[in-house]
Amino acid sequence: VALVVLAFGVLGLLWMHQQALLQQRQQLMRSVAIGIADDLAERMRLNAPQRAMYAKTWGHVSPSAPDCTHTACTRQELAAWDQQQLQLTLQSQLPEGDTAVFAVSDAPNWLGIVIAWRDANETYRTDTASGSPNCPTQMSCWRLFLRPDR
């Protein structure tokens, strides 16, 4: 009897440890998503006149752009380069991650950024308020609103 109780206790500890590891991973993914969204928001603020060029839907792959780190670029080229950098960042930091950038439906001149990452449990979900796209299935999402011209 004592051995059965001990076995259940060990199984309970293992389950709690596994849950803690899953939560830790989700918090890490959420922190990375917040950083990516913040980086894109700053890029959009610095290039506010081209804010329409930052619009993006789920699964959209950014076209190639000139390397603006060593070459002077126009604002349009800079926006395309920012999108390309976003794609590279997602691939390296949030594998299977995706992003959407949308105009906020009930607030002129405001934009929204949604960063999604693979999560079978869908720990963090976003609603479709203000024109935000649905978070894809089996993914968690982080949403950020910004006004680029401020």
Segments from the language model and where they lie:
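Aliphatic-rich helix starts adjacent to a transmembrane/signal segment
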Residues: 1-37
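Flexible, low-complexity segments enriched in proline/glycine/serine and punctuated by aromatic residues
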Residues: 22-150
